[in-house]
Every structure is written in structure tokens, then in C-alpha cells.
């Protein structure tokens, strides 16, 4: 707020919390300075406020100077109301508007616009002015009271001020003020009725005047303690008090109003006690002259005052003063007059009056004022006893024992009382002892009071050995012998108490004394008080029936009740059972008997019953089980049925749980409500809370019934009950609210495993309070408002100490409960957005309907000056509301932005405000940033140029206040941080950093743009990162998070942040940071249940560091690159710490974070990051330690830890492959750990799958199953990596660990279990991938022993929901996302088929039977898979089609055996292959259809509707390549059933019956429809032309790579190097594509598509297609069964359609085609001279020759046969075994697999790469099965003049020549 210029008066309200000591946080120097500045004003008190006529300054003149003439009417009326001189009136108005007023500027204009609104504002200012005057008096009283109290924080400052003013000056000044206030009259216009609401304002003025008089009286009373009053002061005080009859004369106060009655009573008591204090001389002999003068001056006045009750104490004190201070006791007449004064005092019930004064609320605390009052009364009682109680007569005065009990219940008087012998008030106690047990009630009450005051042990020891027992004389029982007058001796022993073991022995002396009730014998024999109490209880139990319900007047009941109250205090004093004496046991046990006896009475004595229950409550800490059992058996307390009903709503509604309130409910309704006192209810609540605090976990028996009773029958209705005392009502509210707090706090305690009842209790409590019945009562307390709370506190005498059960305490408890309810709402309502009834009331919208206005009311508590906790609770409650309220908090506050800033922000820069409130405000700002943008904007608004508040509203010179914007406060924080980074350790800077963190977290950085634009911003903010690192600071986490967010969201141009990051990664900074982050405690972090999201700072810092590194790695090198040395250092330390943390897995969180960090670090390395073999060895040792530790406790690992560790191992496997291969010992340890992990995962998976099946959860998709699947998938990836590495380069026995644990069998078994489960689809795919990897390697032989067919063949059948009656494999039947669909089954089935193919390819006939079995089972589905291309060509569908056709192509190698096994399946599948080939060929011409099939069903309609030209994209090109693969496989399969081309060409005899014709011959172009499509010559020739065109458009060139090597050749020197030979070849390419010749562009795919297809695939497909065409063409031409017409058609088609192929060969293959037109002329590569040798010898002696094997498949036969028959000698070749690579297609003309490449000039990737030779076979018998050896030829070796090498182009030239010849010959 704007600061007001130096004023003529002080802002006292602001000064009070600063100097009073309530907050205990104001600096002492500030307190001294502020008080010294106003010392003169403090001395003047209320006289500093001058009346209107005290100054000649006119108000109009003043306002004219201030340029505020428009406020003149308003200010004039205010001056008339306050009766203040002009300058002070103006200052009061300014203070109110700048400090107190909470409305907006626009509202202020409205308030001064009309008379009605003006009157309301006048009243508010008048109240503010009244408070200002009262604060002055309160500060002065504080100074006097505490300036000599060492434990007050400012007592030295107070003493200095008091010494400056001096006590005498204060005394004289406040005497003047007392006289002035008593004589003061109201303002003239108020008395004349010329103001609005004059009558009400006159009453308000009178109330203020009376309160100020009372406060001045208290100040004088305290001053009298420090400086006794002299004669003149006493006379002035007496005269002033007498002037208005000791407060009775009040003109404008109504005696019929309770509040006015209380004001008058307070004045009367205060004035009376001030006079009594003045007359209290403890040593009268020292003040004899003063006493004589007082008696002389005041005797007449005082002696005449005997008409009112308040005169009684004055007469008593005056009598005692005369008797003690003069010689009146020696003069008979004077003594008689004194006795008359005493008699009048007794008749006026002076002791009753003194008791009322001592119990009054003004003196009901332990303040100095109360002590002075009680000491004064105590002294008077002592003087009276010293003078008149020699015979015990004082005990007969009415109310004297009640007064004494009240006085000695305070420690300072109780200690004095117990330290005296027989003088003073102790004589009253001696009288009680002499007459015991006649006055048992008074003795019990006195003992209780002394026990409460801390003298319990003294009292108990006294009462356990009382000296005298008084018994009514019974002639029949008491045998006495007279020894003197009234003195007797007991002749026979007497048992005074029946059924009690206590006997008075013979010989005991006694005295006979006559009492009003008869003659009593007082035996001088020790007696125990508790025996007498026991006797009284026995008598009461016997007399119960004779009382006839008249319990109120029963003396016996009063005795027992008082005795039990003392017994309760005595039991509480006992720390254990041993502290309870034997005599105390019976009275305690008989409490239960009393409860049992009186519970059945119609109107029981509730006071007695409450005392009994209180005794049981006191016994609970000692013997709780017995007490609980006995009380439960009485059935007097509420109960519920003992069944296990854990539905909290039933309990909350008391519906269906057997709830009964029992005796407690009836006694409240029938007795206590009528008496308007609720003692038994309070006792029950005390018993309930005491038992609950024992935490015996009996909530169903005790706490839940009690809570239901309180929240159903008491709390919501308590405000309608009548009470004799408001204090008792507040006490019940306090106890109930405290009990609720105890229950809600249970949620924050450590949760036990068997605490369902405790959770039920909390839920019942929360649910009940969230409902309207109880919630509305709670909101009524919260919604009281600061104005009323502060007003009630203003009326209190002691502002330094609140009433224990006052309104302010109830408001605080209610706000605390409300916070807990909002926090725990999710426990009963779940995570739903539904508002509870209580929340609906709080968040009522629109605001016009919000009558409670809870949120604005809570906000109002921010300005409370009496309770330091209310503003803090207000902020915390608003914070909770801001976090949970899903609507605008700004709308509910109903405040403008400047009002919000005034309410909250002004406290932040104020050095006089406590840190606690500042922290609460900053937490509120933090919460609003997260959820409340409107309030956040108000907090962060920094442009105040147009803000009316920032201007001087009254033209006063104002300085801008920093508190108006939190941004400025944050700027100061940054400046302080730059100066001293360690400032961040303090609480306030830490909260500011939290706000920065929240802003970045919620992307609200723009709110502090002005700060961020500063070039030094990042340097200042991040300065703590480069200072000395402090342990357990959350700000490091926040800073790292802020940097991470800025780096992630930024564009990389933040130079200032880049400088900070570069500095961070410097060695001097980064090294200590690594040490700090990786320095973690070994003990598990304790979870804080009070805040579910709270984590230890070191864990948060580690996580933030990990996030920062991960983000920087993602952003590098765009933003910053971590230096290589620091990065390696981080990697090394991270691994070391990770391995170390693996030994402390009780808390998995740090291990998980470290493991994930190391994963991301490793991902940045492409190669090993170690620099030496030693480092590499060390790293591998650490990795093996980690793996061993993981294996040791793998089942206990958290899933994230498993996944991260598996990723680490997998990545390290790739990085350190060489080491694993090189060091067999490391490899063995590594493999054993891998085996252990995978076995654990497989076992876990098998168990989980079995559990799912047993529970029928086949469609379960729980998070647990997902997590377990992820870790297993990572294990499988690790297994793939290991298999790949060791298969290629590992030792021969690397698979021994896998074989030893039967891993392959377990994998097969596991996949068989997961295949049918939809929830394990991904896992099934991964398992099959692993099986495929192993099947490709050396371990494939293990699958022959795994019963693969038994486990998998049936499991690979489609799931049941996909099987339809027609087995339509391509139609979806499970549309539900949680069930199988065909699209989800395709990848699984495709991998299953691929696995079968690979195993078959590796083992041929060993696996042939199993393969045929698979085909037999799956024939229908394989056929559907082959036909799937008509439905979909999505990636998974394409994969399935390729897998199916590859399997069929492979198995056709043994088509004869297949036909024998199942000719039907063979026929159906080959028919499907032909159909697939037809449909595939058509797709090249139907690109839109192809696009639809690729897009899937969801997007097909959009593609079909589109009228735009189809764009050839990567997807389409890739699909055509896949279709080419499919075509190759289809042709391979068909070639098995087509005649061998070489046989057709070379065999002398042709047998047409052995072969069938596969291609149909039809006229015309191929049909484009898909119905009844048959494979024709036209389709195949069309495909040939498509691929020729593709090769042509790609300018395909041949590199002339030899496909064979020449044996038995003497190489010349020039040809020794094969590379030289190849390098001399001509590499021919053409820059211009050939014409299409016979293929029109309309019958061929788009040129763009063809030109981008894979050239190698096109060539491979062309080779296969050419062989099929040639074979079938010759077969047809030579067939005797076909007509000549059809043969002619074939010749014509070949002649016409293959013209483009022939042209392609002529241009690209034939040597010098332009000059040499002969198609038979070919190049001769590797021309060498022949050396005829013995083939057998050459095969064994030549070390350079390679061996050629003829495998069972015929893919390679054409080229090999051609070469063998025409150019090469037949030789036996034995190729080495190799991996079967499904990605490589075998060309029908490919070289032998063992042939090595001899050139590096081949620019294109070959699909049949050469493999390295030299690998050994797995087993000899398998090698024998796989290879068929041909015997050496018997004919002599073929010999020519020269031999040449065969190249790829030779095949094309041969086929071209063949097709050129074919049309012209038969």
C-alpha cells in the first residue's frame, strides 16, 4: 500500500502486532525504536486524541490544502461523529483507507455518493477509531505488565521505555485519563440526535467509553503493584469510582441486555478491585500514617456504602484495614463499629461476591492482572482468618470455602497456601480436618483445587493420614470413659465404616463436640480419606432406593461427586498402577457400580455419573483393557453391530449397521437438555478421546460408534440446544472438533497392514463432514469472518492470551479440518470430478447466490492482528481450495486485482511481518500458478501505471510500495542470490525458487519476461549450482528442472543459458556435481505419509539430474555438447555407483534412476568408451557384478529396474562384442547370467499365464501383465543380440549354457502358452522372433529335439473367435479392441510360418515330416494367407503372404513326398499360388487398388473417393518391391512342377507325359478382373516386360562379376590378381533408355514407379520368369496333345511380347551390338589356357579350387548345368554350411554359395552375398543329410583350347537366343 507521510498521530493498529510479542519475530531493535518514537503518546494514552474544539484549524481549510474539497461533506460528518480535531480526523480517515479498507476504488466512490452508504462507511471508520484508542491502552498495559518478565521477548525494550516515561508519570497520566473518561460526554450532535442512527451510535459510544474506563482501571491496578498508591491517588480513585457508583451509572446502556450487563459488571469489579488493591497493606505498621489519613478521609463515605452487593467486599476490606492498621481492636466502641461493618459485609454475601470476581472472565487467566486480583482477595481472606478464625467460626460464612477453592486452584497461591502452618487461610483447612468427614464436600473440592494447582502429592499425603475422624455419637457402639470435660477414652474398638477394613482401637482419645446436626465424637486416630469416600459410596448405593429420584438435594450424592472428582485428579497424578494405593482401589472400582446402579434411574444424577466416567477415563492409561471391558458391559455408550460392514456410507448414515446411542442418548435428551448443562456428554467425549489416543484398534467398538453419535446427534444440532453458559457450548464444540482432528490425523500416521477399521473410521468422518448436515456447521465457524472474530477479541481483557475454548480457537480448528477434508476427499469420492455437498457450498456460483461467502471470508482472516496463526491458516486453506477448485478462484474471491495484491503482496516486503505468513503467501502463489490463472495474473501484474491505487488518492506524498508486485520481490531475490548464493538455504528464498519452478513447469515464464530478458538472469538464478553444494536442498532439483524445461522448449538460441551450461560442464564444477548427485545414503528413504508426493531431496535431485542429462543428449549438438571427457567420467561414475547401489535394494528408487540414466548414456556411444584394455576389463567386471546381483534377487526387482538393467546389458553386449568373443571366461560368466535372467523371466511368464488361464482372464490387459511382458521382451532382445554375436564369432560351445538349462525347449513351451492369449500378442511375436534367430544359427539342431510340432502346430491355429464356419481367415469377428482381430493375428502367424520354413531349410528331410504335418493342419489357413492379397496388403498382411509363399516354395522341393502325404493340400496350395501370382501381376496395373489395399480398411473409402492423381510415394514403391519378392517365390514354386530347361534342351528323348502344362494359352491381353483368373502366358510375359522396362528405365548395367572359378587353369601373370582381371573388363552403361517396343504405356505401370523399384529384385524376378516362360513354352510347343493353333499362339506371343527383352539384351549384353548383329556372339571373360589334368587328382590337390555341390533344391540348376555341360568339367564341391538368410533370394543362375566375390567394383547390392568359408559342420550326420555328393565323371575331362568364366549377362543372352529361335523351330 502507499506509505502515508509523517502524521500527527500513529497507526496504532499496525503497531500492536509489531511490538506486542504475539508474533515473536519482530527484531528487538525495531521494537525499541518504534516504542521510543511514541513514548509521549503512550504516556498521554487516549488524551492524545484531541476533541474537535481543541484546534482552530478548520476542516475545510485542511481539505483545500490537500486538494480534496470533494470529500468535505463526508469528512465533516465523520468529524461530528468522532469529535476529533481536524488534522487527527483527516489522519484517521487516511489510515483507514490505506490500511484497513479492503474494497475497490470504484466501490469507495459509491460509498461516499449517498447518505446511506456514507453512514455505513462512517460506522466502519468509527469502529476503526475505537480500536485505535484501545490499542494504545493495550500497548501501555503490555509495557507495565511485561517490563520485568524475563521470558517475554521484548522485556528489555519495554523496560527501557518504561524507564524513559517513569512509573509515576504513567500513574498520574492514567489517573487523569480515568477521571476524563468518567466525566466524558458524547459528541454534541449525537446527543442532539442530528446524526444518522443517533441512538445506536450513542450506545456504541457508551460501550467504547466503558471499555476504555475498564482498561484504564486495569492499567492503574497493575501500576499499583509496581508503585503503591499514595493518599491523593487513592482519594482520586475512590472519588472517580464513587462518581458513577462503581460503574453502575451508565446513561446509554440498557441493563436488560446481557452484553451491557456484562460491561457494567466488569466496570464494577474492576473499580472495586482497584480500591481493594489500594487498601491492601501487607505490613500496615509501615503505613500507619497513611492508613490513619485514609480512615479519616474516607470513613464516612465507605461506612455509608452498604446497599449493594459490591459494597460487601469494600466493607470487609475497610474493617480489616481498621483492625490491622489502627488500635480499633483495643477500643470497645471502635471494635463494635468494625464488627458492624463486618456483619454488613457478611450480610451482603461478600465472600460470594469475591468468588464471583475471582471467577470472572477478566481474571480467568494467569496474567499479572489476574494474579494481582487473586492475591488481593487472598490477602483479605488471610487477614480475616488471622483476626477471627481462632475458633473456626469463619468456616461458617457463606461462600468462603468456594472462594478459597477458587483462589488456591492457581499455582502461585496454592504454593503459598501449602507453605503456611496454621496462619492465614490454612486455618480454614484445619477446620475441615478437625471436622472430617462432616465437611467432606468442601475438603474434596479444596483438595481438587490444590491438585490442579500442582500440589497433588502434598494433598494426597495429607488426606491419606487425616488426624481426626468425627463420628455421630452412638451410645450402643461407642463405649467411652470420661477423662475430662468433653474428653473421653474409647473402651472398645469401633469399626466406623461397614464392610471396610478400618478399626479405631480401644484407648483412642476423643472429644465430644456439639454440631447443629447432633453430638459428634472426634476421635484422634489417623484415618484415610479414601476409606471415608468408600464408605460414602457404599451408603449411597444402599440409600438409592430411598432417594425417590431426588438427587439434586442429596448431601450424600454431593459428597460422593466431589470425592470422585478428587479421586480422578489423584488417579491422573499416578504414573502407574503402583501409584494407586489399596484404599483408592475400591472407590475406583465402585465407579462402575455407580454407573450400573443409576443408569436405570429415570432422571439420574448426571453430575455423579460424569464423575464416575471421568475416573474411568483417568484409569484408561493404566488398565485400559479392564476399563473397556467393564464399560462395554454396562451398555451405556453408543454401539454398532460387530459385523464386518466396511461400507463407510452405511456407517456415516447410521443405516443398517445397528447403531444405538443407548443410555448416553437418553440421558442427554431427558436430563441434560432440561438442566442446560452437559457434564455427562463432556465426560463421554473425554473418555472417547482418551481411549482413541491409546490406539488399541477397536474402532468398531469405540471410535466409530462415538463418531457416528457425535456427528449424527450432537454436532449438527448443538447450536439449537440451550446452555446455561456459552463457555460450555464452546467447550463441547472444541472437544468434538479436536476429536475430528485426531481422526483425520490418523491418515498421516504409518499405515499398518490390518488397519481396515482405522481407514473406515477416517472415511466415515470425511464422508459425514462433507455432507451438508455437518459440513454446514463447520462452514459456519469458518465463515464467522475476521470482523466478528476480531471484535470478540477486542472485547477480551487479555489480548496476549486467547481463551482455551474461545471463538478464535474454534475457527482455527474448523479451518484446519476443512483443509484436511478437501485433501482427503478422494478417499471417499475417488478421483471423480463430482463436488461433494460441502464443496458445492464453498464454490457456489454465481457469486450472487453465495450467501456464506466462505472464500472471501477466509481471505478476510489475512488482516487479523490478534492471532498469528489465522492469516497463515487462511493462506493454507486458500491454497488447498486453489489446488482442488476446478473453477475460477478469482470469481469466488469477488475482489479486484489490486485488492488481492493489497491483501497478500503487501506483507512480503514488510520486514516486520513474520516469515511464517510470508511462506504461506508464497505457497498460495505457487498453488495459484498451477490451477488459478486469474489470481496468478493478479499476483504477477507489474504494470501499475494506470492503477488508481498507486496514485495518491488524497494528494499525500507517497512512496511506491514494493509489495504491490511479487515480480519485484522476485527481482530482489535474484539480486540477493547473486551476492550470496547460499541465501537459498533460507526458507523464504527457497519458496521463491519454488515459484520459479512452478512457472516453468506450467509454461508461464511469460509472467516474468522482464526478469528473463535481463542478460544476467540465468547467471543469477543458477548461481547456487556453482557455489558450495549444501546437502538436502530441494532448490537444486528445481534449478535442474527449470534448466531442463528451458532447454527442451527453447530453440537453442539462449546464449546466457548456454554460458551457464558450459560452465556447469567445466571440470571444476561438473566433478563436484557428480560427487554430490551420486552421494546417496545407504539406508532406505522414509516415506512421508502426510504428503504423498514428498520424496527425499537427494532422490529428487538425482531424478532431476537424470532428466537434464537425457534432455541435453537429445538436444546435442544443437544446443550444447557435453565434453567427451566429462561424459566418459559421468559414465564411469554412474556405473560404479549403480553397481554399489545394487547391494542396497531395500529402496529401489535410486537404483532405478541410476540404471535409466546409464541406459541413456550408453545409447550415445557407438563404440566402446574405454580407452584401454584394463579399463575395458574393469568395466566388464562391474557389468558382471551387476548382472550377478540382478540374478541373485531378480524376482524382487522393480520392473523398471529390470528393464533398465536389461537395456544396459544389451547395449554393452553390442559395445563390447570383441571382449566377449576374446575372453572365454568372461563370456561364460556373461552367458550364465543371461541364462539365469531369461529363465527367471520365462518362469514368471509361465506362472502369470497359468494364473490368467485359471482366472479366465484371457483378454486381460492389466498393467502388471504389460510390465512383465516388457521385461521379458527386453530379455528376448538380449538373447537375440547374444545369439547373433556368438553365432558369428563365438567359440564352438557358446550355446552350452543354453542347452544345459533346456532353454530352447522352455522358449517353445512358453510361446505355446502365450500364443492363444490376446494380452500376450506382443510377447508371442517377440518369442517367435527369438526362435527364428536361433533357428537360423548353429542352435537350429536343438529344435529337432524340442517337439516343436507338438507344442506349436495346434497353438498356431487362429484363435477361436477368429474361426468361422467357412474359415474365412480374412474377416474380422472380434471387433472389440480387447479381443483378437485378424490384423493382430497376422504378425504372429507369419512368424510361425517363417519359423517352420527356416527349420526346414536348415534340416531338410530331418524336418520334412514335421513340416508336412504343419501344412496338413494349417492347409486351409495357408491357402487363406496366400489369397490374403485380395483383401489387404498392409505390412503385417504382406509379411504373412511372403511367409506363406516362401514355405510353399521351399516345400515344393519335395513335392513328390508332399503329394503322397496330402495331395489335396498340395493341389489347393499350388492353385492358391497361381491365383496369388495372377493377382499380384494385376496390381502393377491397378495402382489405386494397390493403394487401397496398402492403406487398410479404414482409409480405403477416402482413397476411392479421391479424384486427384495418384502420387507415387515410398509406400507404393516398397509395396511393388514386396510384390516382386512374392512373384519370385511363386515362380520358384511353379518351377518345381515345370520341366527342367536343360533337360528339355539337352536330353535326346522327350517324355511329355512326365510334365504338366502350368500356363494357360488365351487370346488377347490379360484380364484385369479378379474373378476366375487363371495364369496365362500373357500374364507372365506381361510381368517379363514390366521388369525389362524397369531395368531399362533404371539404366541397369552389368558389372560382369564372374559366377564361377576355373579349376586346373594355369593363370598368366596378368591374371594372377583377380581384381586386375575384373578391372580390365568393360563396364557398359547406357544413358538413354530403350523404347517400349511392343508394350504400350497404357499396359505398363507408371514410369516413376518402375524407375524407383529395386533393380536387383527386378533382375532376379526377370531371371525366374524367363526360365518359367522358356520351360513352359518348350513344353507346350513339344506337346503332342495340343493343337497347332495353340502352339502357334505361343510362338507369336514369344515373338511379339519378348521383343523388348531381346532389344534389351542386344543393347546391353551383346558385344559391339552395332557392328555385330549376330545374337550368338558372346564375350569371353577370364580367357585362360586349359591344362588337362586328372579330375580326381585336381579336386584333391588344388588348394585354390572351390567345391561345387548340387543341393536338393533346383534353384541353381540351370546355370550350373549349362556351364557343366558346355564349358566345365563336372567336379565334386563341398560348400561350407552357412546361415540361411530369409532376406536373400536365390537366383536360378547364382554362383555356388561358396564362391567368393572377386571385385569391389560392384556398385549394386547383391541379393545373394558370398559367405565366408571355413565354418565347421554342427554334426556329421546332418552334413550327410544336407549334401548330396556326385561321384567324379567317368568320361575323360573335356578339353578345349581355352576356358572362360560365366557372368550374369550370359544367362540373359542365352535366354534371348533361345526365344529368338523358339518361334521358328519345333
Curated annotation (Swiss-Prot):
GO terms for molecular function: structural constituent of nuclear pore. It is found in: Nucleus, Nuclear pore complex. Pfam families: Nup188_N (PF10487), Nup188_N-subdom_III (PF21093). InterPro entries: Nucleoporin_Nup188_N, Nup188, Nup188_N-subdom_III. Disruption phenotype: Lethal at the pupal stage with stronger phenotype with temperature increase. Impairs sensory dendrite tiling on the larval body. In escapers flies, leads to decreased negative geotaxis and seizures. It comes from the Eukaryota. One of its GO terms (cellular component) is nuclear pore inner ring. Keywords: mRNA transport, Nuclear pore complex, Nucleus, Protein transport, Translocation, Transport. GO terms for biological process: mRNA transport; nuclear pore organization; protein import into nucleus; RNA export from nucleus. Belongs to the Nup188 family. Component of the nuclear pore complex (NPC), a complex required for the trafficking across the nuclear envelope. Required for proper protein transport into the nucleus. Part of the nuclear pore complex (NPC). This is Nucleoporin Nup188. The gene is Nup188.
